[in-house]
Amino acid sequence: MTVVGNPRSWSCRWLPILILLLGTGHGPGVEGVTHYKAGDPVILYVNKVGPYHNPQETYHYYQLPVCCPEKIRHKSLSLGEVLDGDRMAESLYEIRFRENVEKRILCHMQLSSAQVEQLRQAIEELYYFEFVVDDLPIRGFVGYMEESGFLPHSHKIGLWTHLDFHLEFRGDRIIFANVSVRDVKPHSLDGLRPDEFLGLTHAYSVRWSETSVERRSDRRHGDDGGFFPRTLEIHWLSIINSMVLVFLLVGFVAVILMRVLRNDLARYNLDEETTSAGSGDDFDQGDNGWKIIHTDVFRFPPYRGLLCAVLGVGAQFLALGTGIIVMALLGMFNVHRHGAINSAAILLYALTCCISGYVSSHFYRQIGGERWVWNIILTTSLFSVPFFLTWSVVNSVHWANGSTQALPATTILLLLTVWLLVGFPLTVIGGIFGKNNASPFDAPCRTKNIAREIPPQPWYKSTVIHMTVGGFLPFSAISVELYYIFATVWGREQYTLYGILFFVFAILLSVGACISIALTYFQLSGEDYRWWWRSVLSVGSTGLFIFLYSVFYYARRSNMSGAVQTVEFFGYSLLTGYVFFLMLGTISFFSSLKFIRYIYVNLKMD
C-alpha cells in the first residue's frame, strides 16, 4: 500500500501562524460547519484503535489486517488532533447524505494465520476503534469475546464483519453518528490451522434519520446506550458538602480567630500604654504568642529565589486553569474530543508566561533579591524542565511501541518554537516589568538584626502535621469531582458539567486560603516565625494527596494495564500533583501574607 498525505505535514501550515494554535476543525465554537445536500458524499475517516481500558494506548487503525485502500490518504490534522493521538485516513466506506444503504460489500480478504492471531490478540485486549464523520467520533469494539467458566470450558472469539452506521441529521447538517452490530453475528476466528487462510467478507449498512435536536451539544453522545450513568445528583451533593466545609472554615477564621485576635490586640495595646516607660525587651519578657515575634515575623526566608519562582509559576497556572474553565463555560470546546482543550492549554500557557515572570520578579525584588537573571531562569525552568523530562520518558515509551500518541518530530519542533519565541520572551518581559515596578517590602514591623530563638514546638505544630491537615481538607472538597475528571481524562466518560467544575475550583481555592490562615495563626502563636515556606508547603501538599488518589484510582477504580498506559498515567499524574502544589501553595502564601499584615499593622509599636 502507498501512504499519501502524511499527517506530519500539518506543521507546515502551522509554522507561519503560531498564534493560531487552536487549529481548524476543533477550534472554539466550531460545530456542524459542513452543510450537505441530499446525495452529497460524506467522508468517513478511520482513525485509531487500542485497548478499551487504556485510552492513551492507541495505534493506527490500518495497523490491523482490515479493509484499506491501495493508497492511504491522511487527513490534514490540527495541533489538538495530533496531541490527542489522532491519525485520520480515508476509508473505503461510501456514505451519501440522507441515502440509506441496506447492505454493501466493503471488501473481501484472505487472512493468514498470523493475521488472524493479530486480530485474536486485539479482540482479547478489547480493542476499541474510532472513526470520524464530519468531526463526530464513532466508536465501537473490533470483535466479540465469550468466556465460559463452566465445564466444558469455552473461549470464543469473533470478528465483527458487518457494521451498521446510524446517522441523524437536522436540515443540511449531521447532528449525531453511531455504529452498532445489532442483529449481526461475529465471524469466528477459532479453529484455524497454522497453514490455513481465513476468508472474510466485510460489509456495512447506513441508516439516516431526522432529529429535532438543533445543535450537537444538545445531543448527548451517550443516548445510544452510553457507557456511563448520569450522576448529576452526586455532583450537586458533592458541591453542597464542599460548601458546608467552606462555611465551617470561613466561620472558624472569621469568628473564632478574629475574636481571639481582637482580645489579643486589645490586651497588647493596653499593656503597652500602661508600660510605656519600660523597654521593648522588658515588655517581651511578660508577653507570649504571636505578638512577641513581631520583630522576626517579616524576616526574609532562605532560598528566596526559589520561593518567588514557585509563586510566579503558581500564579501563572491559576490564570491558566481559570482561563480553561471559562473557555469551557463559553462552549468553546468540542465535548466529544479533547484536542481543542490541549491546544488551548498550550496557547494559554505560552501567553500567561508573562504572569509568572512578573509575579516572581516583582516579589523577588521586594524582598531584596539581587540575582534577577537567575530568578528569571529559575522561573522559566520550574515547570518546563520537569514537564520536558516527564514527556521525554512518556513519548519514548509510545514511540518504542508504535503508538500514535508519540508526537512527530515536526510537532515537537513546533512546540519548542512556541516556547522559545512566545513563552520565554514573555517571561522575560514580565520579569522586567515586575522588577521595575517593585517597591521595597512594606513590613508593618521592624526586623531585628539578630533572630529570636524559636522555642521547642509540640508535635501537632510540626510541618508534617500542617501538611497533612492543610492538604487533606482542600482535597476532601474536590475528591468526588476528582473521580469524574479522572474518568474523563483516563477513561471514556465525557465531562460537560463545566459550571460545577467552576464552583469546585472556587471552593478549592477558598478552602486553601482559609486553612492556610488558620494554620499560620497556630504557627505564629507558638512563637515560630518561619511561616514563609510553611504556608506554601501546608496547603500545597494537596498536590501530594491528588497524586496518592491517582494511585488509588489506578489500582481500584480503573482497569488500566500495560507499560504504555502505566507510564503515561503515573508520569502525568505526578505533573498534575506538582501543578496543584504550585497553584495552592501560591494561594496559601498570599493569603497568609495578607493575614499577617492585617494582624501586625494593628499593633501599637514604637
UniProtKB/Swiss-Prot annotation:
- Sites carrying sugar chains: N178, N401, N559
- Origin species, per record, is Pongo abelii
What this chain does, per the entry, is described as: Plays an essential role in autophagy.
The record describes its membrane topology as: Multi-pass membrane protein
InterPro entries reported for this sequence: EMP70
Q: Does the keyword Transcription regulation apply?
A: no
Q: Which UniProt keywords apply?
A: Autophagy, Cytoplasmic vesicle, Glycoprotein, Lysosome, Membrane, Signal, Transmembrane, Transmembrane helix
* UniProt GO cellular component terms: autophagosome membrane; cytoplasmic vesicle; lysosomal membrane
An example Gene Ontology biological process: protein localization to membrane
Residues spanning the signal sequence: 1-27
Q: Tell me where it resides.
A: Lysosome membrane; Cytoplasmic vesicle, Autophagosome membrane
**Domain of life assignment:** Eukaryota
Q: Which family does it belong to?
A: Belongs to the nonaspanin (TM9SF) (TC 9.A.2) family.
What this protein is called in its record is Transmembrane 9 superfamily member 1
Q: Where do transmembrane segments lie in this chain?
A: 237-257, 310-330, 339-359, 373-393, 412-432, 469-489, 499-519, 535-555, 570-590
Q: What is its main location?
A: membrane
